[in-house]
């Protein structure tokens, strides 16, 4: 895998696993004793964490470093969690849309 493609895959996975585990960038940064700007750069592919940080992240997320950097398939458990998160995200999006529609109707009634 070319270097740039690998770095982008790492960035995507870092963001994916962080959100899957419910951390904000600031919370994760605090756990790692790094700045939230560093975490943001990692997730945008502008920088890559060193192997020590990747190892720590793999322990936090309960995955291998290989999974974290996209070199092996995600485990079945991780895939199931991802599906559940996506389902929840869609449900939240629908609820948000309904709430906005209700608010608009209420505003029109006034």
What are the roles of these predicted feature ranges?
Residues 52-67:
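DNA major-groove recognition helix of helix-turn-helix/homeodomain DNA-binding modules
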Residues 1-20:
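A short, Lys/Arg-rich alpha-helix, primarily the initiator
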Residues 22-41, 56:
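Short alpha-helical DNA-recognition segment
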Residues 19, 33, 44-46, 73:
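Residue-level detection of the helix-turn-helix DNA-binding "recognition helix"
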